[in-house]
């Protein structure tokens, strides 16, 4: 701390609102790095899966084609969006996705696939990380320095994941065949473990984000009655939205439905904020809509692969009907036992 104070003594006096803008930018950068790491790891898993399927070599070639400029644009745009997005709307986005994710996971037994969750949660994950940082560093004496440390660590993880993604796209086929590279051999043996690892990491991230989101929203209320006037319509609105979207996605799991779901969610949140929110929240909802659409466009190829994989899993795993013993009857002097299939 003495070194920081000594170093800060040489800096000119800067207004407090400037440091607030810097902190928002740093929080947005950490959130953008988290989204990019999730994107890179999911891309590695889907690329290896497509390589192992002779019918998906075209998709593997599309995943192999990477652009450094597009990745830089992706991180930069998300950083700008998260830095402009208010913590209140970001917290609402996190809570809405958490409720929707629980509904989707519970409906897996009814035939709905869940592999798209890693891509559908991208923007919500960034909102959760930014919201958590805003809550955890509230009132911290050295908030900017802590956020700089978080940016350094997140950028290091992003660089390593981007490096692995690039290496796998170029050398995985050769190294896995020649048994040459340790990274490629590890992925050859354990690439199936990437989704469970991401699932556990997302559970922890959204658990912390949900707690921070509730705290961020409640800090604006002066009394319990005021909080209840906000939470009651919010809970009803979110519950109805989740039920409606879940039914629509099961009946029509298409690319158009994914974008339609985003507009329905943001439209419902917009109406809610016009009723119990502030005018700044309405502007932040449009910013959130831009971020959601951008994340879906950037992951368009991967979403299509996941959607096809979910459809193939449902086709290849038909429900098995249990066998029960039916009535016993006699024909031609012999006693036969009839077996009947009971539909589930």
Curated annotation (Swiss-Prot):
Q: Is the keyword Cell inner membrane assigned to this protein?
A: no
Membrane topology, from the record: Multi-pass membrane protein
Which species does the entry assign this protein to? Answer: Xenopus laevis
Q: Give the transmembrane ranges.
A: 18-38, 75-95, 117-137, 139-159, 201-217, 228-244, 257-277, 282-302
Q: What is this protein called?
A: Transmembrane protein 82
> Which InterPro entries does the UniProt entry name for this protein?
TMEM82
What protein family does this chain belong to? Belongs to the TMEM82 family.
Predominant location: membrane
| Keyword line | Membrane, Transmembrane, Transmembrane helix
Recorded name of the encoding gene:
tmem82
A GO cellular component annotation in the UniProt record? membrane
Where does it localize? Membrane
């Amino acid at each position: 701390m003495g070194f920081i104070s000594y170093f800060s003594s040489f800096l000119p006096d800067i207004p407090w609102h400037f440091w607030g803008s810097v902190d928002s930018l740093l929080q947005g950068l950490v959130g953008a790095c988290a989204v990019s790491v999730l994107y890179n790891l999911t891309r590695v898993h889907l690329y290896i899966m497509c390589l192992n399927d002779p019918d998906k070599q075209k998709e593997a070639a599309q995943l192999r084609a990477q652009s450094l400029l597009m990745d830089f644009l992706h991180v930069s745009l998300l950083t700008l969006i998260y830095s402009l997005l208010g913590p209140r709307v970001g917290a609402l986005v996190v809570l809405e996705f958490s409720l929707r994710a629980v509904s989707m996971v519970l409906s897996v037994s009814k035939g709905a696939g869940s592999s798209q969750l890693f891509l559908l949660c991208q923007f919500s994950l960034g909102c959760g990380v930014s919201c958590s940082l805003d809550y955890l560093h509230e009132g911290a004496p050295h908030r900017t320095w802590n956020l700089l440390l978080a940016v350094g660590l997140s950028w290091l993880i992003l660089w390593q994941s981007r490096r692995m993604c690039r290496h796998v796209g170029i050398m995985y086929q050769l190294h896995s065949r020649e048994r040459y590279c340790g990274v490629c051999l590890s992925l050859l043996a354990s690439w199936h473990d990437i989704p469970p690892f991401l699932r556990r990491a997302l559970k922890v991230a959204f658990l912390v984000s949900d707690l921070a989101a509730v705290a961020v929203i409640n800090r604006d209320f002066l009394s319990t009655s005021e909080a209840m006037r906000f939470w009651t319509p919010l809970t009803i609105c979110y519950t109805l939205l989740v039920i409606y979207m879940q039914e629509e996605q099961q009946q029509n799991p298409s690319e158009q439905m994914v974008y339609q779901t985003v507009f329905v969610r943001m439209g419902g949140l917009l109406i809610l904020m016009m009723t119990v929110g502030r005018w700044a929240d309405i502007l932040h909802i449009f910013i959130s809509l831009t971020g959601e659409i951008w994340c879906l466009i950037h992951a368009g190829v991967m979403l299509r692969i996941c959607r096809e994989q979910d459809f193939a899993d449902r086709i290849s795993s038909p429900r098995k009907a249990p066998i029960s013993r039916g009535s016993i009857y006699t024909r031609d002097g012999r006693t036969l036992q009839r077996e009947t299939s009971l539909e589930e």
